A protein has these predicted regions:
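Minor-groove-contacting beta-hairpin "wing" of winged helix-turn-helix DNA-binding domains
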Residues: 66-74
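Short, locally clustered residues in the helix-turn-helix/winged-helix DNA-binding domain
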Residues: 16-23, 86
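Short alpha-helical segments that sit at the start of domains
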Residues: 1-17
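Short acidic, hydrophobic short linear motifs in intrinsically disordered regions
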Residues: 24-37
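Short amphipathic alpha-helical interaction segments
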Residues: 40-55
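Short, amphipathic alpha-helical interaction segments positioned at domain boundaries
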Residues: 76-90
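A short, conserved structural fragment
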Residues: 54-66
Length: 90
């Protein structure tokens, strides 16, 4: 199982990848397998990151059997958070 720092990093990487791939459009999503392969996150850690982010209402997840994300999308709150972080960085 991942350490706390790794889990936090996975969550940030998922949010960033979603925001960049969808250009902040909540109607678009990314297949979970593509997200896992692109980010090279272990399957169980990706599932844990998605579960956490969905619980925070930052993403929505359509699940496949076996706790594998089928499709992952940003919510309005997720977009707002990513835009606020982008503004802070300048």
């Amino acid at each position: 199982m991942a350490t706390l720092r790794e889990r936090q990093g996975y969550r940030e990487r998922v949010l960033t990848a979603l925001y960049e791939a969808t250009e902040g459009n909540r109607l678009l999503g990314i297949p979970g397998r593509k997200l896992r392969n692109d980010l090279r996150i272990p399957e169980e850690d990706l599932a844990a990151a998605c579960t956490y982010l969905a619980g925070e209402e930052l993403i929505t997840v359509d699940w496949e059997p076996g706790n594998t994300p089928a499709m992952v999308s940003l919510t309005h709150q997720g977009i707002r958070r990513m835009e606020a972080e982008k503004e802070e960085r300048g």
